[in-house]
Amino acid sequence: QEISAAEFGRMWPAAKTDDVLAAFHVPDEGRVNPADLAMAYAKGARMRGARIVEGVTVTGVTSDRGRVTGVVTDRGTIAAEVVVNAAGMWARELGERTVVSVPLQAAEHYYLITDTVDWAHPDLPVVEDPDRYGYYREEGGGVLVGLFEPVAGPWSLDGIPTDVAFASLPTDWDRIGPYLSAAMDRFPSLHDAGVRTMFCGPES
């Protein structure tokens, strides 16, 4: 639902609103811990008879007359009527082993978490600011400021390493600094807040 700049300011009292023409509030939205959600899905799948096999490398996809029939792994071939490519950063490389093109490239993703600020609390709604390429939410008493810059820095163009899951990458301050400063201008007091965490990692 569309709300006024004043209503947005009441939801986030620390926000700069003099350049806001309108905002959109989605009261039914929420966020979850992705690891907890994955575990819940896995538990539900097992309860319904699924078998989950971990630590397996998929090396190919089998097909018959243009239709997928299973996957080839380092532990043998598994027949399947449906194969879902949920390989994240590796989805393009897996797709290349089939006739399916997955236009995806891992890129650097940045976020920082500030030290505790007195106006942050868990009931604050998540804010997305497309003009500043930023998103914001409360995190542990501070504020998480994340970036989705218009042209992200690509990572590992020659192929994604197979032994990387949660990599931490060096921060390219020259490239990301202006975006970060602009994003934090939405909440000017954050410029004076300490930084608890600054993170850059690959994301699909």
Set out the residue ranges of the language-model regions:
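A short alpha-helix-loop-beta-strand transition element characteristic
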Residues: 1-6, 101-104
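Short loop/edge segments at beta-strand edges and connector loops
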Residues: 4, 54-56, 197
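A general structural signal for well-ordered alpha-helical segments in protein cores
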Residues: 5, 38, 91, 176-180
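Short hydrophobic/aromatic beta-strand or adjacent loop that forms the aromatic wall/cage
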Residues: 21, 107-111, 131-133
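Helical element adjacent to the flavin cofactor pocket in flavoenzyme catalytic cores
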Residues: 24-82, 90
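Structural motif
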Residues: 67, 77, 82, 111, ...
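Central helical "cap/lid" subdomain
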Residues: 77-125
